[in-house]
Each structure stands twice: as structure tokens, then as C-alpha cells.
């Protein structure tokens, strides 16, 4: 197989047409840009088939998209699937070298998750926060004991700063960032990411920030 890296995201569509990938890894914003680009061309050229337009934008071989670094909505995932592109979400961080979970493309019912935990990786939820223990977890931050103490508990669990939960099949779900929680006057914690994701599904909403 051949691995291609795009060092200039403004040229990603050019590189896709040049290298004709079968699998691509992008953040959700780029995936949304793909779908929007195809929708715009479809509207401008109603006489052209969706397959023809998709192949013009994304090449003839792309059939799988791996998303990370943010939430990939079910609506966006379905739009890509209608184009013949199966999606999957993964989760990781540099401190874990980097994988924590990987997508399972056979489980469409788990599309809202970020995949199942990788072998040897253990997760616990403390006050809503995802904490990880694995042989791949870092020993600490170089020459920064204070930051290391903040990131790794005394019993060796890495604090990710992300909120989420694990279901009974070891699929991991993300709810937002711990630092972003909004505490209401009644003491209830609200994750702005969950609100954003909910309204992002609405076709009348182009962009939203909470």
C-alpha cells in the first residue's frame, strides 16, 4: 500500500484527485467540506449524476473515511454512506501513543461511538471524565513534574480531560471536554459540545457555537 500525507489542507481536493486514495483520515470539518462541495456541484449541475460528481471531487476509489479530532454527526456519516463511503470514528491522544479506541466498520449501530477499546487499553470514568491505563500511556511530560502530576493519578491512570462513557460491549462514547462544562444555577453540568452536536444535525443550522 502507499501512504500519502497532505501538508497543505487547502490543496486536499487536488491531492485526492492526484493520488486517488481508497481510505482517508480527516477531521469532521473536512468531511463536511467534502459533502458540501458535492452538494454545491450537484445543485449547479442537476443533469449530472451524483456518482459522476462524487468521482470528480473525491476520485473513483475512495470508499472509507476515518474521522478523529472531533464529533462526526450521524447526519454527516449517512450523507457519506449515500456516496458509497463508509465512515468510522476513532479516539486517541499523543500521551497514549496515540490510540485508545478504533472504529468498527461492521457496526452501524455503534456509529455514535468512537469505536471499541484497543487491546490492552483500560478505561474508567471518574466524575464523568475518561481516564486511561495502558502500556502505551506516557511516563510523564519531559522535565515537567507538576504537569505530569495533573495528568496522571497516583495509581497510574491518565486523565484525558474528555467526558464520556463505555457501554457493555466496550464501545467508547464522548460527551465533551471537562474544562468546557457550563455549571447552571441549579448545579447541573451542561456540555456545550452536546448542544452543538444536537443542533448541527438540523439542516437549517449552518454553524453553531455555545
Indicate where each model-derived feature is located:
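Short catalytic-loop micro-motif centered on adjacent basic/acidic residues
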Residues: 3-5, 64-67, 183-184
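Conserved ATP-binding/catalytic segment of the ANL
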Residues: 117-120, 124-125, 129-184, 189, ...
Amino acid at each position: 500500500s502507499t501512504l500519502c500525507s497532505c501538508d497543505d489542507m487547502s490543496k486536499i481536493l487536488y491531492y485526492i484527485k492526484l493520488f486517488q486514495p481508497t481510505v482517508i483520515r480527516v477531521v469532521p470539518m473536512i468531511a463536511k467540506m467534502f459533502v458540501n462541495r458535492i452538494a454545491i456541484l450537484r445543485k449547479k449541475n442537476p443533469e449530472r449524476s451524483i456518482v459522476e460528481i462524487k468521482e470528480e471531487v473525491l476520485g473513483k476509489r475512495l470508499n472509507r473515511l476515518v474521522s478523529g479530532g472531533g464529533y462526526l454527526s450521524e447526519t454527516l456519516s449517512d450523507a457519506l454512506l449515500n456516496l458509497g463511503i463508509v465512515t468510522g470514528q476513532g479516539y486517541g491522544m499523543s500521551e497514549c501513543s496515540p490510540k485508545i479506541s478504533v472504529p468498527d466498520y461492521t457496526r452501524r449501530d455503534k456509529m455514535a461511538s468512537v469505536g471499541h477499546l484497543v487491546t490492552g487499553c483500560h478505561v474508567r470514568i471518574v466524575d464523568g471524565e475518561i481516564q486511561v491505563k495502558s502500556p502505551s500511556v506516557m511516563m510523564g511530560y519531559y522535565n515537567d513534574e507538576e504537569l505530569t502530576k495533573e495528568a496522571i493519578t497516583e495509581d497510574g491512570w491518565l486523565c484525558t480531560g474528555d467526558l464520556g462513557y463505555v457501554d457493555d460491549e466496550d464501545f467508547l462514547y464522548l460527551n465533551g471536554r471537562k474544562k468546557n462544562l457550563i455549571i447552571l444555577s441549579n448545579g447541573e453540568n451542561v456540555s456545550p459540545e452536546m448542544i452543538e452536536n444536537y443542533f448541527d444535525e438540523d439542516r437549517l443550522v449552518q454553524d453553531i457555537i455555545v
